[in-house]
């Protein structure tokens, strides 16, 4: 058996292994996309301009209104979910939402909310056809 040929030295010295650096926002080559925060600001602003065209709203007031809408949404959704569970249904329908609104909002406010919602849904349905 012939002796093994000696290996020729590599023309370039092998690169030294660098210790793995911890990835942080500053060293990461990819730019992090800013997470989108969903708010009701644009809708609140549109309603404000429909009712009071010459009135503005501060950032703090908009934040308060956004929190208010989120709170009411959570309350109605939670109550509607309970109502659906009581009736052994897995779907929240308009009836559950309407009943939840009547339970959560007091007196006249509930009546006005239900009538406005009914009117708006009727208007939306007729526009879609």
Swiss-Prot record:
Residues with PTM Phosphoserine: 11
Domain of life, per lineage: Eukaryota
Keyword set includes Nucleotidyltransferase: no
Location of cross-link Glycyl lysine isopeptide (Lys-Gly) (interchain with G-Cter in ubiquitin): 123
GO function terms (MF aspect): DNA binding; protein heterodimerization activity; structural constituent of chromatin
Family to which this protein belongs: Belongs to the histone H2B family.
Protein name from the UniProt record: Histone H2B.1
């Amino acid at each position: 058996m012939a002796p093994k040929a000696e290996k020729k030295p590599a023309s370039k010295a092998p690169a030294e292994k660098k210790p793995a650096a911890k990835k942080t926002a500053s060293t990461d080559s990819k730019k992090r996309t800013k997470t989108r925060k969903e708010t009701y600001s644009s809708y609140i602003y549109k309603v404000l301009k429909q009712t009071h065209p010459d009135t503005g709203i501060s950032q703090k007031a908009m934040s308060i209104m956004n929190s208010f809408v989120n709170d009411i949404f959570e309350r109605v959704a939670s109550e509607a979910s309970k109502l659906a569970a009581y009736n052994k249904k897995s779907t929240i329908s308009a009836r559950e939402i309407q009943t939840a609104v009547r339970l959560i909002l007091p007196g006249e406010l509930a009546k006005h909310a239900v009538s406005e919602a009914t009117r708006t849904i009727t208007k939306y349905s007729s526009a879609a056809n």
